[in-house]
């Protein structure tokens, strides 16, 4: 799901084949994206949600075959749609502050995961892979709260509501606060839970 959001269309059948070690046809970039995502999601239980070093490692694993700067913050300015991300010179400080908040905040973990996801996308700390790593890290945070969340296909739900996902980010940026994005992501988490319940009883 998270790869399709970013425009990788290998599809479930080919991705399953890659997991099983079979050869599949696809561009080098598509295959590298899938292999990186598989490796990163396999380590979901090992990542410590409040450790910046673990997020950098996750980015390296996710993007290693795609990006020469995988695992390092960007050194260039970036613009995403109408959003101009913070200057690269302050990215490290912003990320340290974000992780300090993540570690010390008394907010409920569901809220923390959504707030972190939005703030991470606002900072846009990497030159590529920000969407993927932001969604992965929200899963890491939720999984640390309750392992049941590792079973929830939140990324697949977001994929199905992709337009609304980007609009929620845009609305939060325009308002200079994360409420629209938090509400959207909580709704996606609820839909994921409802899907699991439906599958269990049907």
Task: Set out the residue ranges of the language-model regions.
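FIC/Doc superfamily catalytic core
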Residues: 1-202
